[in-house]
Amino acid sequence: MMESGEALLKKLDGRLSGLRGRLTPDTGMDKITWFRAGGPAQVLFQPSDEEDLSAFLKAVPEEIPLLVVGIGSNLLVRDGGVPGFVVRLSAKGFGEVEQVCDTQLRAGAAAPDKRVAAAALEAGLAGFHFYHGIPGGIGGALRMNAGANGVETRERVVEVRALDRKGEVHVLSNADMGYAYRHSSASPDLIFTSVLFEGVPGERDDIRRAMDEVQHHRETVQPVREKTGGSTFKNSEGTSAWKEIDKAGCRGLRVGGAQMSEMHCNFMINTGNATGHDLETLGETVRARVFENSGIRLHWEIKRLGLFREGEQIEEFLGKIV
């Protein structure tokens, strides 16, 4: 069991006094994640801007755990909470999107994907329509190479600006990001703060039409009005995760307040009172049943983080829990 956030802040008394951002101890992560479930952050820090974030990183000893989140769209937080500091980049300091030349946009890491799509439309830049259908933020899109409708983030990235654990600035090229399917090999210790994107000049009517098609498809096949973290598992080579989940009889499967959506069975939803334990147990149950049915190992696309409550544990799949 972790100590209180107040106790952690007391240990660092004086180190953080010059920060302009907001420090909040013992903040429920259920308030900032789309699943609306999970335990508290020991301390939540919302920096004012990149300079404030750098000062924070320089002040906090490296042995204290630190986790960065964006808008919380693909996070599953365990019920025991998240020890150390959770850094949440705010829209005010990290959410701007601006056109910097004829074909380029610069976006803050806290900008919603949809805002980038809208800015690209306004600038007459094609190649960003897929962001209109991704329920997340740019920082997460950079970290996991988010994609949809056959397009991926890596196709648009020129360079990424980041801070390391010591608060120093790094600029990473597209190659430095080490992109693969739903993955970047950039150091997990780097905190992305902004990105320079490259688009292709296009007709606004064509771009708007492509965005409308993305939105229509999403609303038709995905549970957009539910408390969900988006796609639960990555697609496996040669097949889609939802097909394997469906074949294993897991469409609509429930554990406590968690359910695999009837509309799209690769979407896990909180039906109202799910705990983090419910959600993760459901996911591992699905993985086990899919493996038993087809021999395919599904890999989580949703990021799981935090501590289990005392006495709780979840076995990894491979038939151990079913």
UniProtKB/Swiss-Prot annotation:
Record Gene3D superfamilies: 3.30.465.10, UDP-N-acetylenolpyruvoylglucosamine reductase, C-terminal domain, Uridine Diphospho-n-acetylenolpyruvylglucosamine Reductase, domain 2
Key words, A-Z: Cell cycle, Cell division, Cell shape, Cell wall biogenesis/degradation, Cytoplasm, FAD, Flavoprotein, NADP, Oxidoreductase, Peptidoglycan synthesis
Cofactor or coenzyme needed: FAD
One Pfam family recorded for the sequence: FAD_binding_4
Active site: R182, S231 (proton donor), E301
Residues covered by the FAD-binding PCMH-type domain: 36-202
Pathway field: Cell wall biogenesis; peptidoglycan biosynthesis
Subcellular location: Cytoplasm
EC top class, as a word: oxidoreductase
InterPro entries assigned: FAD-bd_PCMH, FAD-bd_PCMH-like_sf, FAD-bd_PCMH_sub1, FAD-bd_PCMH_sub2, MurB, MurB_C, MurB_C_sf, Oxid_FAD_bind_N
MF-aspect GO terms: FAD binding; UDP-N-acetylmuramate dehydrogenase activity
Coiled coil: none
Catalytic activity: UDP-N-acetyl-alpha-D-muramate + NADP(+) = UDP-N-acetyl-3-O-(1-carboxyvinyl)-alpha-D-glucosamine + NADPH + H(+)
GO cellular component annotations of the record: cytosol
Entry EC no(s): 1.3.1.98
GO BP field: cell division; cell wall organization; peptidoglycan biosynthetic process; regulation of cell shape
Functional note: Cell wall formation.
Family recorded in the similarity comment: Belongs to the MurB family.
NCBIfam families: murB (TIGR00179), PRK13905.1 (NF010480)
Entry-linked PANTHER family: UDP-N-ACETYLENOLPYRUVOYLGLUCOSAMINE REDUCTASE (PTHR21071:SF4)
Stated name of the protein: UDP-N-acetylenolpyruvoylglucosamine reductase
Gene name for this UniProt entry: murB
